[in-house]
Amino acid sequence: MKNRLSGIYRDDVPFKPYLTALFTFGMAYGLYKGILDNYLAEVVAMGEFDRGIAEFFREIPGLLLVGVLAIMYRFSAEKIFRIGAVVMLAGMVMLSAVPASRVIVTIAICIYSLGEHIQLGMRNTLGVQYAKPGKSGLSMGKQTSLYDLGTLLGFAVITVAFLILPSGGTMFRLFFAVSSAIIVVGVTASTRMGSGSRNDADKRRFYFRKKFTKYYLLEVTYGARKQVFFTFGPYLLVLHYGAGASVMSLLFAVSAICCSLLSPLVGKLIDRVGYKAVMVSDTLILVVVCFFYGFAEHFFPTNVSFVICCCMYVLDSVISLASMASNVYVQDLSDSPEETRATIATGVSVNHFVTIFVALLGGWVWKITGIETLFTISAVIGLLNSAYAATIKTSKSPAK
C-alpha cells in the first residue's frame, strides 16, 4: 500500500496525514448523512418544499466560498483545510445540542456546510498538487476512495444501530455528538500536514480568466444536475416510500462501496482516455437514471419501484465520479499550481450559483408538478452539460 501511494504522490508532501484526515472526515460525514434526511422528516417535520428551503441555505456557503477564501488568501491550502474542519465541528456540535426547530437546525446545517465547502475546494486543490506529474486523476481517485471508505464505515454504524435501537430525537442527537468527536480526531491528524503549499503569486485564491470560461459553465450545469439527486433523491425514498434511517444508511453504504471500488478506476480512465471523453459520456447513463427515478412507479408496483429507485441512486453516485475529470481539465489549462487552486475554488462557487436555486425551486416543482417533472429537468440539464463538454479542445494527450 505504501509503495502504491508513493507511486502516486510526491515525496516532499505530507500525503499520509492528509489521507488520514480525509478518512476520519469521511467517517463523520457518514454518520451525519446517514441520519440527516430521517432526522429532518421524522423529528423536524420538514416536507418537500421545507427540505428545498433547508437545502437552499445549506448551499449558500458554496456560493460565498470565493469571498471566504479571499479573506484567507495569506493562508496555505493546508491551513485552510484545517479551518474548514473546525467550522464543520462547530456545526456538528450545534446539531447535537439544539432543539428540533426548523430555523435553528437549518442554521446548524449551514455552519457545517460552510466548513465542508471550505474543505471541498482544498481537497481538490491538494489532490492535484500532491500528485506526481501525470497522476492527477489517480490521486483524485485514491483520495475519493479513501474518503468514501470512511463514509462507508459511518453508514454501517447507522445501519446496525437503527436496526437494534429505537429511532427518535435523542438517538439522532447522540450520533451527531459521535460525529463531532470523530471530526476532532481528523483535526488532530491535519495538524501534522504543516503549511507547505506555496501562496498564490498574485495573492488571490480566486479569479475569472477567459480560458476557464467553459469550465465555469460546465460547473453550473453539473451543479444543477447533481443537486436534484443529492437533495431530493434520498428525500423521495424517505417521504414517499417510508424508508427508515437504517434502510437509507444501507443504501448510502452500498453507494459508498461502489464509489470506493470504482473511483480509482475512473481516475485511471481519466488519465488514459482523457477528461473530455469522460465528461461527455457520463450523461448518456444519466438520462436512463433520471427516467427510472422519476417514472418507475408508473410501470412497476411500489415495492419494485422502490428497489429500482435505490439502484438508480447508486448508479447516479457512480457516474458522478466523472466530475473528477473537470479538475484535471483545469490543471491542463493552468500555468501554475496556484492558478489551479484559485480556479477550482472559484469553480466550486460557480457550481453553487445555480445549485442554490435548484434546491429552492426543486422542492416547489416536486410539490406542485410532481417528481416526474423534476427528474425530467435534471436529464435535460445533463444533456446540455454533455453537449457543451463535447466542445472542449484538449491541449495534452492522454497518458499511455
Model-derived features: where do they sit?
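Hydrophobic core of transmembrane alpha-helices in multi-pass small-molecule transporters
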Residues: F23, G91, V103-Q119, V304-L321
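Short amphipathic helix-loop junctions that connect adjacent transmembrane helices
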Residues: G34-D50, T231-M248, V330-D332
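Intracellular juxtamembrane helix-capping segments at the cytosolic ends
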Residues: L36, I118-A131, L321-D335
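Helix-to-loop junctions at the C-terminal end of transmembrane segments
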Residues: L64-A77, F162, L262-Y275, W366-K367
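Cytoplasmic membrane-interface "Motif A"-like loop-to-helix N-cap segments
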Residues: Y73-V86, R272-I285
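C-terminal ends and interior cores of transmembrane alpha-helices
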Residues: V86-A100, I285-T302
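Glycine-rich segments within core transmembrane alpha-helices of 12-TM secondary carriers
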Residues: G141-T159, V348-V358
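C-terminal membrane-cytosol helix-exit motif in multi-pass small-molecule transporters
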Residues: I158, F162, S180-R198, Y388-I392
